[in-house]
C-alpha cells in the first residue's frame, strides 16, 4: 500500500475522498496483481493485445451495466475476442481492483491518526499468541463466558451500506453494489451461503475487507453499549477510523440510552467484563451472575436482527461456566481450574500450613481435531495410526525429511503454550513415523529394516526435542531456564493459525 503514495495527490484526495477515478487508472490494477493484468490475460487468451488491459477494464464495467450482458457474451463469444474470456476472470480482475482501491482512504486515515497521536506501533500485538497472556491474566478471576459465533450477512446490500459510513464516493459505492449483484448471477438481492463461500474463496482479499468493515461497525456499537453499562469506562479502544456523522450518532445513542434507561440497576453493571475476538468467533466473559450474561445475549441478538438485518438466534451464543466447560478458541482448549498449593509459614515458635487454591487457565492441545486434520492430510488414518505419504515418495530423502521437519516445527511452535505436552508428543510421533514409513516405502523396505540400515545421525535433528536445543546452544544453561522452557511459551511472531491446526 505504500506504493500508492507515489501516485496519489494526497491533499486533494483527503479533501474529496473520490475513489471512482482510481478504477480507470492502470497502476491500481498493476499494484493489485503484482505484475499487472497481462499475466491473467495471457493465460486465458494467448495472442491478444497485452497493451489493452485498461481498455479491457473499461469494457468489463460497461458490459456490467448492460441488461443483456449474459446473452451477448453467449452469442458473440466467437465474434468478439473480449467476450471469449472466462467470467471468473472478469470478476477476479474487478474484485482485486475494487479491494485495493477501497483500502486507500482507510490506510491514509490510519497513517494520519498514528502520526497525529504519535502512537508507537507494536507489531508484536499482531501475534495470535499475544491474546493468551491476556486470557491467563483475566479469565481465572471470571465465572461465566459466552461463546459467540458472529453471523455474517447474507444480504449484499448490508455490506455496501456498512461501507457508506466510511466511504463518501457515491459513484464508487454504486458500481460496487452493481458488481456484487452481478456476481451473484441472480435478480434477487439475497444470496445463499454457498454463494458467499464461493465469493470468499475466489476473492479472499475483497471478501475479508467487506467482512471486517461489517465487524468494525458491529463492534463500534457493541463497545459503546458495553461502556455505558460498566463502572469502568473505556478510555481507548484502539484506532477508530473516521465515520460519517459518528459523533452525531454517538450523541443520539447516548440520548436514547439516557431516556430509555435513566437509572441502571447495580446488578446490571459489571466492572469485570472482557471481550476478545478472532475472525468470526468471539468470547464475552464476566464475573457476574448468569442473569447479566443472558441480558447481553438478548442485546446482541436484537442488535444483529434489528440494526444489521442479519438473522440470528439464541443458539449461536452459548453461556457456560468457566470452571466446568472448556473454550474452543484459536485451536486451543482453554479451561479454568483450581491449582492447589500448600505454603508452610513459620512465626517464632509456631508454624502452620496455609492452603491456597488459586485459579489457573489451562491451555490444552485439541488432540482429536488435530488427528482428524492429519488424517485428512494423509499423515495417518482416522484413529491416528501413521501411514506413508504417497505424494512425497518421488522426492529425495533430504527433501522428505526437511518437509516433515518443517511441519513438525510449525506445530510445535504454535502449540508451545500448551499446559500439557503429552498430546503434542503424540502428534510428533505420528509425523515422525509417517516420515519413516514414507522413506521406507520409497526404498521398498519396512520401517524397522530401514531404521536399522540408516545411520543414527540421519534423524538426529528430526528427533531432537525443542527443549534439547537449549542444551545444545547453551550447554551451561541453568535449571531455572530449562524449567521455564518446559513450561508454556507464547511467541510474538505468529500472525495466522497453521493449516493443520485450523479445525474450526
Curated annotation (Swiss-Prot):
The keyword RNA-binding applies. It holds the Pfam family MatK_N. The keyword Repressor does not apply. Its main location: plastid. GO terms for molecular function: RNA binding. InterPro entries: Domain_X (IPR024937), Maturase_MatK (IPR002866), Maturase_MatK_N (IPR024942). Belongs to the intron maturase 2 family. MatK subfamily. HAMAP family: MatK. Usually encoded in the trnK tRNA gene intron. Probably assists in splicing its own and other chloroplast group II introns. This is Maturase K.
Amino acid at each position: 500500500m505504500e506504493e500508492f503514495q507515489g501516485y496519489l495527490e494526497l491533499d486533494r484526495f483527503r479533501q474529496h475522498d473520490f475513489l471512482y477515478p482510481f478504477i480507470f487508472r492502470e497502476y491500481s490494477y498493476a499494484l493489485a496483481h503484482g505484475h499487472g493484468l497481462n499475466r491473467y490475460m495471457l493465460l486465458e487468451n494467448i495472442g491478444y493485445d497485452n497493451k489493452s488491459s485498461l481498455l479491457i477494464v473499461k469494457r468489463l464495467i460497461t458490459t456490467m451495466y448492460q441488461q443483456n450482458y449474459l446473452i451477448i457474451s453467449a452469442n458473440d463469444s466467437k465474434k468478439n475476442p473480449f467476450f471469449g474470456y472466462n467470467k471468473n476472470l472478469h470478476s477476479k480482475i474487478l474484485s482485486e481492483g475494487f479491494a485495493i482501491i477501497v483500502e486507500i482512504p482507510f490506510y491514509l486515515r490510519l497513517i494520519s491518526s498514528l502520526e497525529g497521536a504519535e502512537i508507537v506501533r507494536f507489531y508484536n500485538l499482531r501475534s495470535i499468541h499475544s491474546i493468551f497472556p491476556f486470557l491467563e491474566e483475566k479469565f481465572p478471576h471470571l465465572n461465566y463466558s459466552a461463546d459467540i459465533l458472529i453471523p455474517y450477512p447474507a444480504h449484499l446490500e448490508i455490506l455496501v451500506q456498512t461501507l457508506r459510513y466510511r466511504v463518501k464516493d457515491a459513484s464508487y459505492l454504486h458500481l460496487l453494489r452493481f458488481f456484487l449483484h452481478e456476481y451473484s448471477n441472480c435478480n434477487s438481492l439475497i444470496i445463499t451461503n454457498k454463494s458467499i463461500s464461493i465469493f470468499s474463496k475466489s476473492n479472499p482479499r475483497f471478501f475479508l475487507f467487506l467482512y471486517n468493515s461489517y465487524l468494525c461497525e458491529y463492534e463500534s456499537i457493541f463497545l459503546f453499549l458495553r461502556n455505558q453499562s460498566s463502572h469502568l469506562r473505556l478510555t481507548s479502544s484502539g484506532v477508530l477510523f473516521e465515520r460519517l456523522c459518528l459523533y452525531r450518532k454517538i450523541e443520539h445513542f447516548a440520548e436514547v440510552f439516557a431516556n430509555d434507561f435513566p437509572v441502571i440497576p447495580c446488578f446490571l453493571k459489571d466492572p469485570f467484563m472482557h471481550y476478545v475476538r478472532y475472525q468470526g468467533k468471539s468470547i464475552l466473559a464476566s464475573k457476574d451472575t448468569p442473569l447479566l450474561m443472558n441480558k447481553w445475549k438478548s442485546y446482541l441478538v436484537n442488535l444483529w436482527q434489528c440494526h444489521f438485518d442479519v438473522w440470528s438466534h439464541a443458539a449461536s451464543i452459548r453461556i457456560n461456566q468457566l470452571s466446568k466447560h472448556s473454550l474452543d478458541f484459536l485451536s486451543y482448549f482453554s479451561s479454568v481450574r483450581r491449582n492447589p498449593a500448600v505454603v508452610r509459614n513459620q512465626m517464632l515458635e509456631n508454624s502452620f500450613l496455609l492452603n491456597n487454591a488459586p485459579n489457573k487457565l489451562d491451555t490444552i492441545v485439541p488432540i482429536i481435531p488435530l488427528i482428524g486434520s492429519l488424517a485428512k492430510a494423509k499423515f495417518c488414518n482416522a484413529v491416528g495410526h501413521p501411514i506413508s505419504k504417497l505424494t512425497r515418495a518421488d522426492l529425495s530423502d533430504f527433501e522428505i525429511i526437511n518437509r516433515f521437519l518443517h511441519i513438525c516445527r510449525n506445530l510445535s511452535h504454535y502449540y508451545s503454550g500448551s499446559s500439557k505436552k503429552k498430546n503434542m508428543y503424540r502428534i510428533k510421533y505420528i509425523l515422525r513415523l509417517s516420515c519413516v514409513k514414507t522413506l521406507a516405502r520409497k526404498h521398498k523396505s519396512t520401517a524397522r529394516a530401514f531404521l536399522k540400515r540408516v545411520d543414527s545421525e540421519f534423524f538426529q535433528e528430526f528427533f531432537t526435542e525443542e527443549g534439547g536445543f537449549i542444551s545444545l546452544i547453551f550447554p551451561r544453561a541453568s535449571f531455572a531456564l530449562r524449567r521455564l522452557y518446559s513450561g508454556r511459551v507464547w511467541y510474538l511472531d505468529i500472525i495466522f493459525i497453521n493449516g493443520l491446526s485450523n479445525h474450526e
